[in-house]
A protein has these predicted regions:
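DEDD superfamily 3′-5′ metal-dependent exonuclease/proofreading module
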Residues: 1-77
């Protein structure tokens, strides 16, 4: 996070390039994880470390209808 508590460009870019490293959706880009999966983590607790921070960020974007903001960051356009 940046000083203002907003995600930096690097974190947003990671959402469209980093794959889920474990679980039911292993190998799926974090930006492509289904909302119900992200919401489950929000209820049960995000894992520690960077993956947890990225999942929490993606859950916030998805929950607030802002996931389309990631489209320009995707490699495929």
């Amino acid at each position: 996070m940046t000083v203002d508590g907003l995600p930096g460009a690097e974190q947003l870019q990671l959402l469209v390039t980093r794959a889920m490293p474990f679980g039911k959706h292993k190998g799926t880009l974090i930006a492509d994880l289904p909302g119900n999966y992200l919401n489950w983590f929000a209820r049960e607790g995000f894992p520690p470390g960077e993956i947890g921070r990225l999942l929490a960020l993606m859950q916030e974007l998805d929950h607030n209808g802002l996931a389309d903001l990631l489209k320009p960051l995707r490699r495929d356009g």
